Amino acid sequence: MPKYHLKAPYSPKGDQPTAIARLVEGVNQGQRYQTLLGATGTGKTFTIANLIAQTGRPALVLAHNKTLAAQLCNEFREFFPDNSVEYFISYYDYYQPEAYVPVSDTYIAKTSSINEEIDMLRHSATRSLFERNDVIVVASISCIYGLGIPSEYLKAAVKFKVGETLNIRSALRELVENQYSRNDIDITRGRFRVRGDVLEIGPAYEDRLVRIELFGDEVEAIRYLDPTTGEILQSLEAINIYPAKHFVTPKERLNVAVQAIRDELRGRLQFLNEQGKLLEAQRLEQRTTYDLEMLREVGYCNGVENYARHLAGRSAGTPPECLIDYFPEDWLLVVDESHVTCSQLKAMYNGDQARKKVLIEHGFRLPSAADNRPLKSEEFWSKARQTVFVSATPGDWELKQSDGHLAEQVIRPTGVLDPLVEVRPTQGQVDDLLAEIRIRAEKQERVLITTLTKRMAEDLTDYLAENDVRVRYLHSEIHSIERIEIIQDLRLGEYDVLVGVNLLREGLDLPEVSLVVILDADKEGFLRAERSLIQTIGRAARHVDGMALLYADNLTDSMSRAISETERRREIQKAYNELNGIVPRPAGKRASNSILSFLELSRRLQTDGKDADLVQITGRAVDALDSDQDAGLALDALPELIDQLETKMKEAAKNLNFEEAASLRDRIKKFRQKLIRNT
């Protein structure tokens, strides 16, 4: 059994010991589904850490967004400094999928931007799963997408061992086949160089260099080096260098795959011709024939993922292998904020297939492209042997699956009570809100404000900034790493107020926040449903003076139930504190930034020398610009305009408005060329 060393400056308190014991018993007895129902701030993460430590299982902790995943990863790294805690999220900073719009006969090629630091962390996760059994991987929903074949990835690793004979030519050939490139001048991740009897490699999964020192044909030494100073960090007896990409296809399998693709193409062309779809048949034949030539000659082509089923040797309709398949058999799944995450699992497959269907029907892809997909919900759950759902508001599906196997946490170890909830009328709400913000700012406390629409959030941010409030606006187009920075800066006091739409609910650990404001609380819908209201109110549940302000003119059923549940928990907590002589105290949790320091950010805010708030709120200025005005733009205005256009392009791609995204992409390209010509 893996040995987890849980290190914490405190021991389980309140109802944590009971919850831990119940969950551990359930896992040891083989219970497939359990639920930890814990109010915000009751230490659910610490309870799960104790569960993992006591059961000794490799664990996958699934979060519904990248920000929450980063926060959880930080916490688990603090609890388990001697064990392997990994971070696995999508490595795309920007991703516009391949698409076709039949109405306008517009084809849009796939465009993307990969974050190299996150790619390194993904490789680090799979490497740890192969080499250790004390592994906790904190992941987003991206873990249900195809990730090569674990057995081939492991088999392809290039092995070095001190004292063994090494054929250097064979080793270099294997590195190239594993998609490492030779560069004798600049060595970074995914590259290697040879200098005399020394081979240096930049592994895909870490930022240290590996030096293999030879004496003749014998491996004399293996060392880790600092990539900047060249200082020797560690000496090793043996090492495996895993492929630079997760998708590894042996030569013999590639030949079989090429033939299978050719056979499928032949059958599909016959079908299209019989249907009288001559244009589609010609298009498909031309594209696929070119791809086959590229695969045969260099082993790769643009859009190679569309042939993943053939390259992996899978049958039609079979699920792809993903991160889950890299885990050993006795792994444990923890689904954080399960009421949101489980719904996401169900939605991913349908959205992917709708887009692929159009591409296949119009001759852009073979039918097998549909098998390059995320797991279906039922496929995912069939792979999960034991699951613990974690939420303050678990969904009906999770409760049904758990079948009464439930552990509840209401008591906070700090003695902090659930926030006071106050409903105020909407008339004069902005001025009232401004007064409340100033009170908190004087006490160096933080405020979260959630609105119903993006436009409303932008307008409110504008107004607060004009009234000298230190405010930021958190929106969906912000890169995942920058999003983590924004949360970090709020905690560190760089600003006092954070405004958002649906980004301020589940799981955010912000003990400095004393006030949560919910505008339009009486507008029934997803964002103002009972569970959403309870979650949003809970963002102030880590502060001794926590308070939630709901601006509304009516008391809806959702509001009434959310307020009643908050008051019920508050009464239980108050009674426990009185019985045990507990005085509420601040959480005192420091603002950890281990993910940020680990990543060596490729960029920070794009506002060097400018007012951050102004740049954040002027995105709508892009709407006033059309292509006829582009020629007259001043050069010094182009960098900011490019940033704003990129934001709009990403929003359009996210909303499946591919024509607008492609148009914006072309304008960005034109502006960049103009900058290059004139600088």
UniProtKB/Swiss-Prot annotation:
- What is the annotated localization of this protein? Cytoplasm
**What organism does this protein naturally occur in?**
Prochlorococcus marinus (strain MIT 9313)
The record's GO molecular-function terms, alphabetically, read: ATP binding; ATP hydrolysis activity; DNA binding; excinuclease ABC activity
InterPro entries according to UniProt: Helicase/UvrB_N, Helicase_ATP-bd, Helicase_C-like, P-loop_NTPase, UVR_dom, UVR_dom_sf, UvrB, UvrB_inter
Indicate the family of this protein.
Belongs to the UvrB family.
Superkingdom of this protein's organism: Bacteria
Which SUPFAM superfamilies would you find in this protein's record? C-terminal UvrC-binding domain of UvrB, P-loop containing nucleoside triphosphate hydrolases
Which pairs of positions does the record mark as disulfide bonds?
none
Place the motif Beta-hairpin on the sequence: 91-114
Q: What protein is this chain from?
A: UvrABC system protein B
The Helicase C-terminal domain is annotated at: 429-591
